[in-house]
C-alpha cells in the first residue's frame, strides 16, 4: 500500500480562544496576548492584518506581530482571518471567469533545499491533462529561482492583470497570478518579512491567498508543524486540497522518501503517510532534484516536457498526479486509490503525448500576442 492513515481532525488546530469582552483592538492588547502564549480572540488577527494591509501598522508592529504569532503557534482560525483580510484587499479576477473546478499547484517555499521548480512544472502538466489551472506565485525569496522567475525565463508573461489572466485561463487552460500584481497592499508586510529573514506565519499566506480562489489544489508546506493549520483553513472553506510535506523537508510530494499528506475534503482533514514506492517510483537522492538559477530551471522544464526521463520527471509526474487527485476530490464519488492511478496515468500521458510541451508553447505565444 502507498498510503496509511495516521489520524484525522475536523479543521482548526488548537481549539477556539476563550471569549473575551468586546473592545476596540489595539497593538498592545494583541501583542500582549501573543507574548503571553494565548490565542487571539475572534477578529483580532483580522484587525491586525487590516492595519498592515492599509499601511497603518509600523514596521516594528508588523515584525512583532509576525514573530510573536509564530512563536505562540498560530491556529487555523487566526491564519484564516489573516488570509481572508488579505484576499479582501486583493485584485480579483472578473466574475464568472474562473471555472468551478480550477486548481492551484503551489508551495510555501522556505524548505531551504533549492530544488528545480517542481510545482511550476506540475502545473503545466496538470493543465495539459485537461484540468484548468490558475497558479499563484512569486519570485524567489530564499532560493535561486522562484516559480515566477522560471516562468519568465521560459518566456511566459508573469505581469498580467486580472482580465488577461482570465483570458489566458480561458484560451490556454492555465493562468498565472503574480502575487505583487494582485496583492499590492501586501507590500508593507513583504518588506518587513524580507528584513526578518526567518520563516514566520506570513510564509503560509501565499498558498492561502490565490486571488482566483480555486476550490482545489496541491499545496506544499515546508513546515511540518504548520501544515495541519493550513489544512484547517482549507477545510473551513470546504476546499478539496492535498496539503503535502515531504518527510525530507520538501514543500512538495517527494520521491526521496515518504511524504505526509493532509487530505482536505468535505470540511474535514485526514492525515496520511504516502509512499511513492507503492506506485512503482524509484527512490531518488535529494541532489538529483537540485535546481539552479532561472535559466537553469527553465532548461530543466524544457527537458522534462520534452520527454527526458529520470528523477525530476518522476517528481513532476507525482506532484501533477496529486493535483489531479485533489481535482477529483471535488466529486463526492471520487475514490482515493483509483484517483491516484488515474492521476498518474493522465500526468504521464500529458508529457508523453507532447501535450504539456505544446501547452507551454501556446502560453508563451499568448503572452507575445496580447
Swiss-Prot record:
Record text on cofactor binding: Binds 2 magnesium ions per monomer.
Q: What is its EC number?
A: 2.4.2.18
Q: Which Pfam families match?
A: Glycos_trans_3N, Glycos_transf_3
Q: Which cofactor does it need?
A: Mg(2+)
Q: Which GO terms describe its biological process?
A: L-tryptophan biosynthetic process
Residues that bind Mg(2+) 1: 119, 252
Q: Does the keyword NAD apply?
A: no
Q: In which pathway does it act?
A: Amino-acid biosynthesis; L-tryptophan biosynthesis; L-tryptophan from chorismate: step 2/5
Q: Which reaction does it catalyse?
A: N-(5-phospho-beta-D-ribosyl)anthranilate + diphosphate = 5-phospho-alpha-D-ribose 1-diphosphate + anthranilate
GO CC, sorted alphabetically, is: cytosol; extracellular region; plasma membrane
Question: Acyltransferase as a keyword?
Answer: no
Q: Which UniProt keywords apply?
A: Acetylation, Amino-acid biosynthesis, Aromatic amino acid biosynthesis, Glycosyltransferase, Magnesium, Metal-binding, Transferase, Tryptophan biosynthesis
| Alphabetized GO MF terms | anthranilate phosphoribosyltransferase activity; magnesium ion binding
Per UniProt, where does Mg(2+) 2 bind? 251-252
Q: Which residues carry this modification: N-acetylalanine?
A: 2
Summary of the function given for this chain in its UniProt record: Catalyzes the transfer of the phosphoribosyl group of 5-phosphorylribose-1-pyrophosphate (PRPP) to anthranilate to yield N-(5'-phosphoribosyl)-anthranilate (PRA).
UniProt family annotation: Belongs to the anthranilate phosphoribosyltransferase family.
Tell me which HAMAP family the record gives: TrpD
NCBIfam families recorded for this chain? trpD
PANTHER family assigned: ANTHRANILATE PHOSPHORIBOSYLTRANSFERASE
Q: What is this protein called?
A: Anthranilate phosphoribosyltransferase
Organism annotation: Mycobacterium tuberculosis (strain ATCC 25618 / H37Rv)
Amino acid at each position: 500500500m502507498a498510503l496509511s492513515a495516521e489520524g484525522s481532525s475536523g479543521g482548526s488546530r488548537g481549539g477556539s480562544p476563550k471569549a473575551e469582552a468586546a473592545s476596540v483592538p489595539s497593538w498592545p492588547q494583541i501583542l500582549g496576548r501573543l507574548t503571553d502564549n494565548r490565542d487571539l480572540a475572534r477578529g483580532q488577527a483580522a484587525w491586525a492584518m487590516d492595519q498592515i494591509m492599509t499601511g497603518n501598522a509600523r514596521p516594528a508592529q508588523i515584525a512583532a506581530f509576525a514573530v510573536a504569532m509564530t512563536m505562540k503557534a498560530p491556529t487555523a482560525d487566526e491564519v484564516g482571518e489573516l488570509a481572508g483580510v488579505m484576499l479582501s484587499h486583493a485584485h480579483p479576477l472578473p466574475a464568472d471567469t474562473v471555472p468551478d473546478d480550477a486548481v492551484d499547484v503551489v508551495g510555501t517555499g522556505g524548505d531551504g533545499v533549492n530544488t528545480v521548480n517542481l510545482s511550476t512544472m506540475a502545473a503545466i502538466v496538470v493543465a495539459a491533462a485537461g484540468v484548468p489551472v490558475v497558479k499563484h506565485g512569486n519570485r524567489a525569496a530564499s532560493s535561486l529561482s522562484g516559480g515566477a522567475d522560471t516562468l519568465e525565463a521560459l518566456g511566459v508573461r508573469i505581469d498580467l492583470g486580472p482580465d488577461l489572466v482570465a483570458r489566458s485561463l480561458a484560451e490556454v487552460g492555465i493562468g498565472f497570478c503574480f502575487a505583487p500584481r494582485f496583492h499590492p497592499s501586501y507590500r508593507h508586510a513583504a518588506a518587513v518579512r524580507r528584513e526578518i529573514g526567518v520563516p514566520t506565519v506570513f510564509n503560509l499566506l501565499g498558498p492561502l491567498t490565490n486571488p482566483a480562489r480555486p476550490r482545489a489544489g496541491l499545496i506544499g508546506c515546508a513546515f511540518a508543524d504548520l501544515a495541519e493549520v493550513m489544512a484547517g483553513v482549507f477545510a473551513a472553506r470546504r476546499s478539496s486540497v492535498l496539503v503535502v510535506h515531504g518527510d525530507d523537508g520538501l514543500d512538495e510530494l517527494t520521491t526521496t522518501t515518504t511524504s505526509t499528506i493532509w487530505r482536505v475534503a468535505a470540511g474535514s482533514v485526514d492525515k496520511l503517510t504516502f509512499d511513492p514506492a507503492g506506485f512503482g517510483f524509484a527512490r531518488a537522492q535529494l541532489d538529483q532534484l537540485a535546481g539552479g538559477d532561472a535559466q537553469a530551471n527553465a532548461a530543466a522544464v524544457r527537458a522534462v516536457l520534452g520527454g527526458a526521463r529520470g528523477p525530476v520527471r518522476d517528481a513532476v509526474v507525482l506532484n501533477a498526479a496529486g493535483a489531479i487527485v485533489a481535482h477529483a476530490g471535488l466529486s463526492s464519488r471520487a475514490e482515493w486509490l483509483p484517483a491516484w492511478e488515474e492521476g498518474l496515468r493522465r500526468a504521464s500521458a500529458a508529457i508523453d503525448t507532447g501535450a504539456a510541451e505544446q501547452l507551454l508553447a501556446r502560453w508563451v505565444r499568448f503572452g507575445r500576442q496580447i
